[in-house]
């Protein structure tokens, strides 16, 4: 999931840093109906709100992107995303066959280069040139339970 922290300052000892957390919201729901034929609808939304405090080196609304750290599988330039996944599964005795369609759309912002330094918004958000990238995926399921 989306999360991390940023460097917001240098402590009085001039060696240690002060940190600020990233803030985000993640909401997911899964609804299922039926037994022999199962209808499933999964949906979710994630919003990145940036860091609590401005990042170290912030000026004119931008800060060095190197002062922002995200978890390994996250993207620091992601602004928001949503996912919708309808699924149908037919249970036939010990067999089950299913089909799932997944639609995921993510809004990314671009980094800005200032004096040769890759920068992000002072609050840790990449909000320049926001654009959506959408992915479609279809998966099939065949299962035998013994």
Model-identified regions with their sequence ranges:
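Low-complexity, intrinsically disordered Gly/Pro/Thr-rich segments
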Residues: 118-129
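Outer-membrane beta-barrel "beta-signal"
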Residues: 132-146
């Amino acid at each position: 999931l989306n999360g991390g922290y940023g460097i917001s300052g240098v402590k009085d000892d001039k060696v240690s840093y002060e940190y600020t957390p990233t803030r985000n919201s993640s909401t997911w729901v899964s609804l299922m109906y039926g037994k022999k034929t199962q209808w499933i609808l999964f949906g979710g939304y994630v919003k990145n709100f940036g860091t609590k405090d401005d990042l170290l080196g912030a000026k004119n609304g931008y800060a060095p992107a190197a002062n922002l750290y995200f978890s390994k599988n996250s993207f620091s330039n992601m602004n928001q995303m949503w996912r919708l996944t309808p699924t149908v599964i037919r249970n036939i005795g010990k067999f089950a066959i299913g089909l799932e369609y997944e639609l995921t759309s993510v809004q990314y912002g671009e980094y800005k280069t200032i004096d040769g330094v890759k920068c992000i918004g002072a609050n840790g958000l990449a909000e320049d040139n926001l654009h959506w990238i959408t992915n479609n995926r279809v998966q099939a399921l065949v299962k035998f339970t013994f």
